[in-house]
Amino acid sequence: PAFMIGAIRSLLTIAPAFILHEIAHKIMAKRYGCWAEFRADPSGLRFGVIFSAITGWVFMAPGAVMVLGRTTVSQFGRIALAGPVTNIVLWSIGAIAVLAGYVTGLESNITNALLETWIWGNGVLALFNMIPLGPLDGKKIKTWSDTVFWIWLTIAAGTVYANIKILGPILGPMT
């Protein structure tokens, strides 16, 4: 039962974080006249399912949006930035909901559990994708602009810091 509850919780919180992150890439790519399509990676999905079953933590790389077309370095960087920015916006919505629930007293165990996974999922996804290595967004953003990269890396790291120091204590111990 605990695994099923965790799976449902992740489906409601982590799946939107990932899906909207990828849709943001596609929307920006289309804006620049590029072809963009999600490509599944079964090995990343298998790894994620096994990792989650063993550790209880959700970490999946089920695929990514592939972009084809003529873009400038700036456009490609902006396409990459759309994903982490989306996660930071989603994290902000969750953070506001946590604070609103705390201030008004309209919080519940179920809501807190969902918000906890929401803020952690979006914060970590934004920060992870800002790593400037391999196929991750951070590398494309840094290639485009060091300044933009460092600003958004700092913001993404700030979401995780806020989860630990501010929002985590409000929500209570991880469930």
Regions found by a protein language model. Give the residues of each.
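Hydrophobic transmembrane alpha-helices and their immediate loop junctions
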Residues: P1-T175
